[in-house]
Amino acid sequence: MKNKYYPLRSSMDELSAKNDNEIDLEKGPLPEYNSEDGSTLPPYSENINLKDPKQMGANNPNLFNTDESTTPPDYGEDSLSITHRENHSSGTADNSSTSPLKKAFLSFISIFVLNVPAVCYLTYKDALFKDYGKDEWVYFAVWCASCLMIFISLWYFYETWIKAVKVTVIFLAQCIKVTVVFLAQCVKVTSISLAKCVKLTAVFLAQCVKVTAVFLAQCVKVISIGLFNIRREMMIIIWLLWLIICCILFGCVKSGDLNLNKALIYSTCTISAVLLLIVSSVCIPFWTFERTLAKLAKVFLLQSGIVLVLNGTMFLRGKHFEWTGCEIEASVLFIMGNVLFLCEMECPGALIRTRNSIRNGIAFILEGAGRAIRGANDNNDIPLGEMEVESEV
């Protein structure tokens, strides 16, 4: 015989408890009920004056409802065990939702992916099902049996290895994400560090260049002032010594005792240009450096013209000139530089006066030619009447 469990409280008790706990805002707080004298009615009781239970049930149809749906349930041992199993299994996932076909397909795909490298290797070696003997077929059978066992294991433990694969994939994704973020941070920090290093290096080099330029400018200024304040006789002595050295070098080269053609040419050109630069910047200090370079360029152009004229003249006369163009250039530069240096040292301001004289002479010639041309035009514009009057007079 089964033991049935019935609830201790009926619907009447629930209704009374509900009425006891509720307070009607329109009627006010609940009055105290005295059960001995019965003078005080139960709180808000509407059905207490009704002596007929049917009338009470009419007011509250759920009070004496004898429908089967309201009968107490059967709380036997079987029902309790079933309810316990349902509640226990409701918190876990239903593993039977995955179809067997899906399990088999995913398990086969896993085995296929694992066997692809072996098949590719055997195909590459041209050893797949080719010249198989007894041992090879035994190995192949073992391989097939192993694949079958692995397939069964994967199919049986589908949820476990799928969960492991998911966890592994998530872990690898997180590792890749962390690695990418770390590399990005490293690249960012490295780029910022390199930018700072480049900036500091550029600032340092700029400061070095600035300091070097200022130092060289100070050195040039001191040397220029010293050369400008030196005695003219000392400058002439230095020039004469240099001239003697150049003549000795020329004589040695032409006599064949010294083979320094290129070195002599380059040194002569360089030192002569330096002498001309010193003359231009020291003896004529109001020339700017740009104008000095322009004068040097004009000197080189003039020398080039002289070289071309000499070579052209020798070519037209049919004579062979032993000197090359570089030697002619060096000789002309040497002569012109030393002549200009000597003229400026003997007569300070001679170059400026020569330049101004040449410019004024050219201007005077052009002005005279212009006046002559205008005078001829004025004589041609005389009217005929004036010419007749002049003839009569």
Swiss-Prot record:
It comes from the Eukaryota. Pfam families: WTF. Residues 11-29 have a biased composition (Basic and acidic residues). InterPro entries: WTF. The chain crosses the membrane at residues 104-124, 137-157, 167-187, 208-228, 233-253, 269-289, 296-316, 332-352. GO terms for cellular component: ascus epiplasm; cytoplasm; endoplasmic reticulum membrane; Golgi apparatus; vacuolar membrane. Residues 57-72, 89-98 have a biased composition (Polar residues). Keywords: Cytoplasm, Endoplasmic reticulum, Membrane, Toxin, Transmembrane, Transmembrane helix, Vacuole. Residues 1-98 are annotated as: Disordered. One of its GO terms (biological process) is meiotic drive. Homomer. Forms protein aggregates. The two isoforms can interact with each other and with themselves. High sequence similarity is required for their interaction. Belongs to the WTF family. Promotes unequal transmission of alleles from the parental zygote to progeny spores by acting as poison/antidote system where the poison and antidote proteins are produced from the same locus; the poison component is trans-acting and targets all spores within an ascus whereas the antidote component is spore-specific, leading to poisoning of all progeny that do not inherit the allele. This is Meiotic driver wtf19. It comes from Schizosaccharomyces pombe (strain 972 / ATCC 24843) (Fission yeast).
